[in-house]
């Protein structure tokens, strides 16, 4: 919902929302609200590994979540899928050129880099950095 509000408040900025499939499933009620508001500058990317990676890779649900089908069902006007590097590149180019609310579902495998560290900033520092960024006027 943060990305939706940013997109509505900053209609001249392209807003990319990155979501995991587990997070999208837990906040499923947000999708119809976003679809109803239809911000043309919002690209909603769902990274779908069919698992809650941050809690040990527990499966999200039997058979996984098809975020693209859910987005289409609730009214997202443009829905794209990427299943490999080639389709990802094509879908990203399409999403960049879209002038309408777009969902891009990206399939990937469960797993993280072994050298992936923990955040080095606090949630308050992250909030302050985001607020400062949003106050900047970009051409």
Q: Which positions does each model-derived feature cover?
A:
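Conserved beta-strand scaffold positions in the cores of enzyme catalytic domains, especially
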Residues: 44, 79-81, 103
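Conserved thiamine diphosphate
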Residues: 58-94
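Short, solvent-exposed amphipathic alpha-helical segments in soluble enzyme
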Residues: 32-36, 61, 96-97, 120-124
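Glycine/aspartate-rich loop-and-adjacent alpha/beta segment that forms the canonical ThDP
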Residues: 98-139
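Short active-site-adjacent structural elements
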Residues: 53-55, 90-91, 111-117
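Thiamine diphosphate
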Residues: 1-49
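Long, charge-dense
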Residues: 47-57
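General beta-strand structural signal in soluble alpha/beta enzymes
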Residues: 17, 80-82, 106
